[in-house]
Amino acid sequence: VFSKSNGIEIKRIVVPPFPENVYILSSDKSDECIVIDPGAEADRIAFEVKNLGKNIRYILNTHGHGDHTAAVAKLVDTTKAEFALHESDLGILNNGSEWLEQVIPNYLPAPNPDFYLVQDQVIKIGDLSIKVIHTPGHTPGGVCFLIQDVIFSGDTLFNESIGRYDLPGGDGVTLLESIRTKLLVLPDDMVVLPGHGSETTISHEKQYNPFLQN
């Protein structure tokens, strides 16, 4: 368990091969939960959800890259959860499937989203409210998810680094603008939970992230 406060429990599962962070969000007040970026090992994610005594209501993806979506199809099929992605990432969803099949265990192409994520949308389960923040740059439809004092930053912002922008649909100028105008304006003590690597805070990134110093 990464964090349990204000009635919210956040569990992080690190899946191979890259490694990538999958997050399970749940609340004491609901038997439903949200899974963010299920990038591999659908059975393990389902096992952890069952251990929490929850059912998956939504699968929310920060972006459409295969290392964040490879377990979506099986989870949707076995749990009937609703899958959501920003519409601008439809063009990259399942790109490189043949390569991904070789490197990600039990890779399956992601299904079409049940609904699309949009800027300022609020998604609720129980007493949890998750706000969508569109942060293009790593991909055109990259988003972050804000819940209370935590931001799930996907591959937009990392601990002392930023997402790659040399992949199809990536743009470095757009990425830095997204980070500066959408993320660095958040409270300094906001905890950042990224798609890869360890957690950080907005204030730490303002001070120490080499990409954000000018």
Predicted regions: what they are:
Residues 2-52, 144-154:
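Conserved beta-strand hairpin/beta-sheet module of binuclear metal-dependent hydrolase folds
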Residues 12, 24, 116, 122-124, ...:
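Residue-level detector of beta-strand face positions
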Residues 25, 62, 135:
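Conserved S/T- and glycine-rich ATP-binding loop of Class I adenylate-forming
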Residues 34, 58-60, 83, 152, ...:
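Residue-level marker for buried hydrophobic side chains located in beta-strands
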Residues 36-37, 85, 127, 194:
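Small/polar loops that bind or transfer phosphate-bearing groups
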Residues 40-124, 207-211:
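Active-site HxH/HxHxD metal-binding segment of metal-dependent hydrolases
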Residues 98-102, 129-214:
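Metallo-beta-lactamase
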